[in-house]
């Protein structure tokens, strides 16, 4: 029985090594190796941000038109710089737009007023949706409420702000919901 097993194994192994026809050189497609002249740049990617002064001015104008004169805005694109082999930045690839607001308030203890102000800011940002700003992804919103030297800082994803309002959060509840993100 052992002889038959060895014979069968030898037969199978020899069948696996049967010669195959060699493909003709003409049947293998020739492809060009991409080079720098083709528009491709080899990059070392590094995280980076770039200010968006035009978008900042548009959002600031919308805030002022809504009567929110105590609010300052800074919009920036977040993404990656393409660093060439010589160490120079070839280009920037935006992934998202982040918005940072600074709000001067009388008191940080009036959560209803802070929540109302936050909701007004989010309503204005609805006019600047993802797709109309640099980058394919929804970014983040940072809000810093300042009263004298005291601050209350919020940092949340744009989608979380939209979701909280869709769930019916307003005023104090909206502030608390987004403060815990």
Predicted regions and their residues:
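C-terminal motif of bacterial Sec signal peptides marking the signal peptidase cleavage site
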Residues: 12-15
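Polar/charged, Gly/Pro-rich intrinsically disordered segments
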Residues: 43, 48, 54-106, 131-181
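Positively charged n-region of N-terminal signal peptides that target proteins for export
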Residues: 1-4
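Post-signal peptide N-terminal segment of mature Sec-exported envelope proteins
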Residues: 25-47
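Bacterial signal peptide processing site
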Residues: 17-19
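Sec-dependent N-terminal signal peptides
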Residues: 6-9
């Amino acid at each position: 029985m052992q002889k038959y097993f060895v014979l069968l194994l030898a037969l199978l192994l020899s069948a696996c090594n049967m010669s195959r026809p060699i493909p003709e050189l003409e049947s293998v497609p020739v492809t060009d190796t991409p080079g720098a002249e083709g528009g491709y740049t080899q990059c070392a990617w590094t995280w980076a941000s770039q200010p968006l002064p035009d978008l900042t001015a548009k959002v600031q104008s919308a805030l002022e038109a809504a009567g929110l004169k105590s609010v300052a805005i800074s919009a920036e694109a977040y993404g990656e710089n393409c660093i060439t082999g010589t160490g120079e930045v070839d280009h920037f690839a935006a992934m998202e737009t982040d918005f940072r607001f600074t709000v001067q308030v009388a008191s940080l203890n009036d959560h209803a007023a802070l929540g109302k102000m936050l909701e007004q800011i989010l309503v204005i940002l609805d006019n600047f949706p993802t797709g109309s700003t640099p980058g394919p992804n929804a970014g983040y919103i940072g809000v810093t409420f300042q009263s004298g030297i005291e601050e209350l800082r919020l940092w949340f994803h744009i989608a979380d702000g939209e979701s909280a309002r869709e769930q019916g959060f307003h005023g104090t509840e909206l502030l608390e919901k987004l403060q815990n993100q």
